[in-house]
Amino acid sequence: PGLTLILLVLIPLMWAMPIGLYCSELTNLAPVESGPYVWAKMAFGEFWGFSFGFWMSMAAYLTGSAYVVLAMDYIGLFVSMSPAMIFIIKAAIIILFTIVNLRGLQEVSILSTIFSVIILIAFAAVAFVGMANWQYNPMDPVIPQGEGVMSSWGTGIAVGVWMYCGYVTISFLGGEIENPKVISKGMKLGIVIIALSYILPTLGGIVSTGPWTEWGITIDYSSVLYQHIGPWAGAAFMIVAVIAQFAIFNASIATASRSFMVLGQDNLCPKFLSKVSPKRKV
């Protein structure tokens, strides 16, 4: 648990902040749609620009589908469903958020903001309740007994980097943001809020709910509310966990689609991927 908390502090400073700042500054200097593709093409030529843009778009779509699966996994903890029903609900989720994205970036933004507020309130509750019921030393041990230092750091960094990824995606929307100068300020504030939303609830969970060896197996963030408030609070947090997956999926559709659109306009992808609606320009 100790190493987890250390990495949750270090990785935002050494990984998330540099990526977030360079993406926000470049978006401010060259506010275009599919920014990473355009910037790479400007710096290294069409081949590497296409490669970078295509890889980023594919990664966004593939990881986006994972969030739908995760949402159904959370729902499956409470409701028993057949494989056919699971497939139907997954398809319905995809269709729903595709419709939201077809409405426009403003609608995506409004929904994402609502989701974000709900998520932050839930994690703030975990942090507050956990630290109010402090029972365990969060730094004992720093590294589990019998585990190698290198393997512990390697695994922790790999997971931590994944947790703090995604900041580059804002640059895919640079061409549609009225005032790109706000991105830099928003990015700095966003990274701080995200880091705290990881660090404080994790600290609250470790110090209030044990043993730490059961975290990720039989104990999670919802367990903090379940044990110290009641079953209803734990169930409510699991609903928020589903909402969190919806929020990420909703945003990933918006960002990934912009890259394919610009690639299509440059004749590097099928042209139909660059088609926009005449009314909403989506």
Locate the predicted segments by residue.
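Helix-loop junctions at the membrane interface of multi-pass solute transporters
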Residues: 37, 42, 157-182, 186, ...
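Extracellular loop-to-transmembrane helix junctions
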Residues: 1-81, 85-89, 186, 190-196
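Junctions where cytoplasmic loops transition into the N-terminal start of transmembrane alpha-helices
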Residues: 3-8, 114-118, 174-206, 263, ...
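TM-loop-TM module centered on a large, flexible mid-protein loop between adjacent transmembrane helices
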Residues: 38-40, 45, 77-78, 188-252, ...
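Membrane-helix boundary/coupling elements in multi-pass transport proteins
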Residues: 32, 55-69, 171-177, 232-271
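Membrane-interface helix termini and inter-helical loops of multi-pass transporters
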Residues: 72-80, 134-146, 211-219
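Select transmembrane alpha-helical segments in multipass membrane proteins
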Residues: 6-7, 45-58, 90-93, 147-158, ...
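Membrane-interface loop-to-helix entry segments
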Residues: 72, 85-136, 147-148, 187-192
